[in-house]
Amino acid sequence: MELSLHDRRKEVRKAHDAELTLVVDDPLPAEVRGRLVDISRSGFRARHSYPRFEPGQQVRFRYPASQGQARVMWNRILNGSVETGFLVL
């Protein structure tokens, strides 16, 4: 029996709606504004309009409750917007 994505997650995710700023320096500097979708103890998912994030890429992030560095884990385009999963470092 195959488990759903929700069943395979190691941590509980909580819906969270807040403004978010992501800063990437490589390959080209960019500041990306978006919104949090959900958070967990080790990461978060964000919706934004920047399609160039690549898995493994490191970014700086800032939202009202936290700031720090994170690694891009996945990136997908859905209905004209981009969603990215991040692991907090």
Regions found by a protein language model. Give the residues of each.
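Structured alpha-helical
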Residues: 1-89
